[in-house]
Amino acid sequence: MKNELIKISIRNLVEFVLRRGSIDSRIKASVRALEGIKGHKKIQSSYSEKDRAEVTLKEDIDFEDFTLRVEGRADGILEENKKIIIDEIKTTTKNVMDIDYDFNELHWAQAKVYAYIYSKEKNLDSIIVQLTYYNVEDFGTKFLRKEYSFHELREFFYDLIEKYKEWILLEKKWIDFRNDSIESFNFPFKSYRKGQRELAIRVYKAITEGKKCFAEAPTGTGKTMSILFPAVKALGAKETNKIFYITAKTTTREIANNTLRIMREKGLNLRSVNITAKEKCCKMEEKKCIPEYCPYANGYFDRVNIALKEALKHKEEYDLEYINKLSEEYNICPFEFSLELSNFCDVVICDYNYIFDPQASLKGILEGK
């Protein structure tokens, strides 16, 4: 039997396992995507003919019952004085003269993973890692370099993988547990209301066939159960990997929560999270996501993974009350934490804006992040 293949990008691997520091909205919005692309192209246009840009790299790591594929694209692979250089380009609005070797550990980590994979592929004893910082406003450029042995890179890489493996095993254990409960789960009422079964069949077929289903029915006809029950069954059959229940009304959101509670009472195991608007769940007088002002933003990334493990091991329904409880216990932003939880939940209940707004915080999940 072929092992399950689990994929993760090099950047996401590094940012999840090694993240440290604080939430700072000033940094998040500092460079727009288009500016970043232009900055990358500007640096890459200066490469020599023997240098290569946007080089795809991947490494498969086999475990007992799954294979982890780590993949990404190195911004540049350069050659200088018979030495190979992995170039990682980072665009910024910060004065590059203020950037030193300790500026961002994650930048080095990402480049080191590329360097390990390439060194292994080409059987290199050592390789140079270069971080190229490019200011999109004043076009200042700074190059930082470190040389690593293959042994150093291999040790770093497998330490990273071991830390991530713990999360994979936690998630695999949950999915097996969840799917066993879905397989034995039947419609939670003795009989269907008029039209309920027909709607449930339509919804299931729409999911499995990748089609759309538009339905209209009066209040009280059991629409929510007719939608969630087949969606959960499709989840257990691996026809989908996440259910989004989107609504503009708090009352409709609560109906979805109550429906999931009924299903859990009948033996279903399912993780669900409610995404509450930042304005409603922020604990501060002013909505300023900067570490100097907000204690829940300050050091957030130092503590969030510990809080995640606590939640995932002991709870299935993540409502605002529970999220606030962990927010106080671990001193983390409740809004950002709810977004973190959505990555691990089977059902995400949220406002329309989180799906359809181009700037929405859940876009990463929808794009397979």
Q: Model-found features: residue ranges?
A:
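Metal-dependent nuclease catalytic cores that hydrolyze phosphodiester bonds in DNA/RNA
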Residues: M1-K83, E105, A109
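Mg2+/Mn2+-dependent nuclease catalytic core
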Residues: I61-F157
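Walker A/P-loop
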Residues: T208-P230
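A substrate-engagement module of RecA-like helicase motors
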Residues: N179-I182, N186, E239-V348, Y352-F356
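Walker A/P-loop NTP-binding motif
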Residues: Y204-K205, T224-E239, T259-M263
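Conserved pre-motif I regulatory segment
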Residues: W174-E216
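Short, conserved "post-DEAD/DEAH" coupling segment immediately C-terminal to helicase motif II
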Residues: A360-G368
